[in-house]
Amino acid sequence: MSESSIENDYPKMKGSRDYGLSGKSIICFAGEDWWIHHPHSKNHILKRLAGQNKVLFVNSITMGLPSMSNADFFLKIRKKLRSYARWLKRIPGGLYVMTPVSFPVYGNRVGRFINRWLLALQLRLVMFALGMRKPIVWVAIPSAADVVDMLDRGLLLYQISDKYDANEDSALSREIIRKWDQNLKKRASLVIYSGRKLFEESEVTNRYFLEQAVDFDHFAEKTTEVAEEVKSIPKPILGYFGFMDYVMDVELMEEVARLRPDWHWLLIGRKSNLVKLASPNFHYLGSKPYADLPKYLQHIDVYVLPWQQKNVFTSYGSAIKVREYLATGKPVVISPLYEYLKTPGVRIYRTVAEFIEAVEDALANDTERDRLARQSVVRDCTWDVRTQQVAALITRLLNNQPAVDVRAYEMRLKASQTFDEGGA
């Protein structure tokens, strides 16, 4: 999604695990920036694959400057310049992170031509330096379409995580984004969807639904250590973590704060200048290291996801944070995201009154049995499992086999749908 909120500082992983894929070179063109955003699916999976493979994570290739009228214009520029300054870094675990320099002028042919060659030259240099030959290329942002075929590559995977042409944060025309998207779909050996709504609406035949997952042990961690910033906040506490931008339903949040002045909101993450909440009930803590989150999360009573309901972009979202919320065991109240409409343990609201009713019910009637039931929903939906799935898909493709065993895959999808309806 858009810029997130939590410093990308993972808890240390326990050694190198065999996920079924080794000795390969992998380049991922990500839709986010490793140094700025909350970890997405690619971050989690590639960090694991880096234990036995050579992995290069390419930070998001800009799709154009935001408008100067954008309230976050200078903030975005400053962050991107800091990322450029790092260019290529190796992080613990062996994964390489690269921020290639490009010009934010994708809206015209000349700009695209310059960027195509500039990006290709940088990537070829890094591939040579790292000894990457015929790498598997994993694309997760449409703007990489212009450069992938300029690399001496092997397999091409295209992951679709969002409704890209509905992103209000992009300065590019919808037409260019759609053209890139269609181009990648035609050339990819496999198109991977991270959201159920995106997958169900797709007409691509070589597609695969890779559900989001959760770093379960991290978010389920119980700790007696409580962060100093939260000790003085009165209860009950409603919690949200993630970047707060135009997708937030500010009107609903303000109205709830007015009607329930005894409720306090703990907001962890960076905040866009577009989000202005005046009530003293809102407590902004800013960005926190990913590894330190348990010290803050244990103090929250109810987790909320107050997103705009009329925003097309967010309606396709698969919000990893909902699974992270469930892993804590705490009650979860969210706007009606298609991805979670049938998920056990999630309370859905559509109006201010329904939001208040859902939170009141959670505060009054929650039990230890409810907590364990919520955790059971995501306990086995871990990034280790997803990494094994991706490794198996790649292995089949490299062996010139269909990526998907159709019969087994259809059975898995059916089981997933039954599970969402509470049947398992």
In which residue ranges do the predicted regions lie?
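A charged, aromatic-enriched C-terminal amphipathic alpha-helix characteristic of glycosyltransferases
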Residues: 367-403
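Conserved catalytic-core segment of nucleotide-activated headgroup transferases in glycan assembly
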Residues: 112-114, 215-299, 322, 349-351, ...
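Carbohydrate-associated surface elements
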Residues: 194-197, 210-222
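Nucleotide-sugar-dependent
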Residues: 36, 40, 248, 291, ...
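A short, active-site helix/loop in glycosyltransferases that binds the activated sugar's phosphate group
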Residues: 187-209
